[in-house]
Amino acid sequence: MKPHLTLKPDFSRREFLLATAGTAALTALAGCSDASHTPLKKSHTVSVGSTVSLDLGGSSWRVVQKGKENPVAASVPGDIFTDLLAAGRIPDPNYRENNSLIQWVGLVPWVYYRDFTVAPELLAQPKVVLHCAGLDTLATIWINGELIAQPENMFRDWIFDVKKHLRVGKNFVRIEFSPCGNTAAVGANPEIDSGGKPCSDLVKRLWDIYRRKHGAALTRDTFFGRQLGNPRSWIRKAPFMWGWDWCPAVVTCGIWKSIELLGYDARIIDVGIFQDHSETGPVKLTVHTTVENPQHRVLTAVFNVMLHGQSVATAEETVTADQCEREIEINHPQLWWPNGMGDHPLYTVKVDLKNSDEVILDSRQRRTGLRVLEVLPPKDGKAMHLKINGVAFFAKGADWIPADNIPSRVTPEILRSYMQDAARCHFNMLRFWGGGYYEPQSQFDACDELGLLVQFEFKFANAPYPTLDRRWMENVRAEVRQQVMENRNHPCIAIWSGNNEVAFFNGYDQLFRDTIGGIVHELNPGAFYEPGSGAAGSGDVHTWKVWGDLALFSEYDTVEGFVTEFGVQSFPAPKTVRTYTDRTDRTSIDSPVMRYHELGESGRGIDYIMHYLNAYFGKPPEDVDSTIWLSQIMQAMGIQTGVEHWRRNMLRSMASLIWQLNDCWPGPTWSMVDYCHRWKALMYASRRFFAPVLISPRIEAKAGQCDLFVVNDQMREIHGQVSWHITTLRGVTVNSGEFNIAAPARTSRKVYGLYFAAAAARYGMNKLLLWADLRVDGKNVSDLMTALVKPKDLHLPGPGLTWTVRKSREGFTVRVHTRKPALWTWLDLHDTSAKYSDNFVHLMPGSTTEWMVSPEKDLSVREFQRHLRVRTVRDVCPAMQG
């Protein structure tokens, strides 16, 4: 490592332009912008082939509390909260303590209704159905005053034969949603009068079944008894909507996905694509197509397989007994690889359903990637791990939770932006947590395109479930079958998991091993399925001694395995905090509103944050903003400790998925990116500690030794040069050296032992910093700075920062020079949101670093300089000010 080094960020200008281009997509996040409520299109009739559809979505709906007057306009898809917010009937649930003021919404029934016009050509079809892609949750549907159905599952796709209930011309649809919020009271007192509400009747029926089974043993004093009073055990609705330790309860209802009338002669129900890979040569696809053919006509399925828009194979097959199966050979197959390991080509399989007159009755397109994925169990000291196309690799990424506690506020553009962020930070895997709602196809599509593998969890979390009830189990079977059929073609899905952290209970095996596992293996042969994520002995590790037990970060050094959940909390960015507080709330980090937005550890999460700040950074700062920034630095430091330990110990550890990538409401949580999509220090740090090539230290303080490891996740061996320096806190070099390294593909190995005992004896352990820089082909690929003591014991002088600003195509280029060590240096525009090419970096004395900054609004150079703040950890940590 040379002094006066100009450091180039690893975020290229092209990547930076792509990142900033997506900023506008995020403005729909509530409270983060002035985005308005946009009405949707009105319904209209469309013909595709011989299928006729009438979209019932749009802004022609009205919604009213049952038994009340004064309805408001409703948008479909949508939900009751967005409709009431648009009408000004409720306050912003995210602001201050407003969430307490909107709880009544989930405790009362709501009625959605509209009229619509049916054209003769729709009713002329042999079959006409109402297709509801998502009803949240306990619904009763009437058309023209006639009862159609009473669905009770938020996650299912509902189809009802309604031809006999329709007429040409004006028709009327009414959907009533019974409240889900009041089931908690019913569960706690199952003998109370339910008032005849279907929701309450459901809970009482299930409770009675368990009362008969367990008798007097089922009491409110037992864990199982308490859990049975929780509505998330009974109702097939996203569990987090009743509140979690990172969000409050927001019990939604409404038509949250598309709704339409479909008229058809025959239609395709499902297309499943199964692969058979030979050692060399072509890949054989077996395309299984299921159709609905009410007229029992002679039908033919025509198949066209395309890559990059060009046809690579065609075939056709006669449909027999509403099914057909055809093998199609793909010559010169292009394999799909995870992010960082290769390309992610996607093959499109188009299926046209034709009658004997060659008329296309229906058409479906499905995409897939050609790959062989294996999940190997723990064995002979090796952790559970993934292998793709014969290559074992380390899984890097995070856990995904819903992007908003009001789902209709989340757009495909927002989801894609999050997935792009993950790919830019070298993630190759995400875990879709089991307590939310099933992620939409647009999110899986983005993962397919970006090479992000997925651990798919069915939506069961942290509760026992009423497996004794036959109707409840039938409901779940239909839900699971739908999810497997919808998602099995996605190459991104690596692991199917039955639940998140559901403790063993009477019926566990029946639900998670036999029922869900059986359906996965039936519909997706060869897929890897585990009954639950984080289950003891599974090899899928959730570790919470750090944070949960307040253990120090060094506790991570005792953990091995396929780690899919671990985390430390921090506050969101000050700008985000300002969206949910007023000025008086920000006079103290411990104010009532600041505590209201912290839901972890039974409301003691702020105390946990302060515990870790004290442990590593000494007495926290007095002002709120400094405490916020310092909490983010602390979080990044802790998670980096765990990730680098597991990467250094590759084979004994083969995954590091951080809890959690994102937020669904604003407040202090474990997230890497806050609710307003502002990157925390941890997200910036992840791009460095998840880099394909990593240089990482292992300190043995008592021995006066630092072992340097090089981790190479790439598919090729690398050769490079390492420069290292030991400096004082004032930037004086006391020792340095260089050496060459060779790192085989997909390995971790110790490359050097650096001894600092003599320097420590002369200067003191708390007066030294170790720096190292790894270059491959002359380019910096990884660097590090490590201290030999906790940060609070480093008494740093002022770094002597200077900077220049110039306008550039992507915004502004900022060049920062430092005379002395500048630790955890970051840029921030005080009153303006912006995207930054990097942040929270360590600047070696005498170095110059270049940032690219893209503000949300247009600024002159003078305005930009007025907003710009350049800070280091020394500015926000009193104990480190030497």
Where are these regions (language model features)?
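Secreted/periplasmic carbohydrate-active enzymes, especially glycoside hydrolases
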Residues: 4, 8-430, 648-649, 653, ...
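Substrate-binding clefts and catalytic carboxylate motifs of secreted carbohydrate-active enzymes
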Residues: 56, 63-66, 238-240, 247-254, ...
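Conserved acidic
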Residues: 108, 414, 472, 508, ...
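Active-site oxyanion-binding pockets that recognize sulfate/phosphate
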Residues: 160, 242, 337, 466, ...
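Charged/polar, solvent-exposed surface patches and flexible loops
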Residues: 417, 478, 482, 518, ...
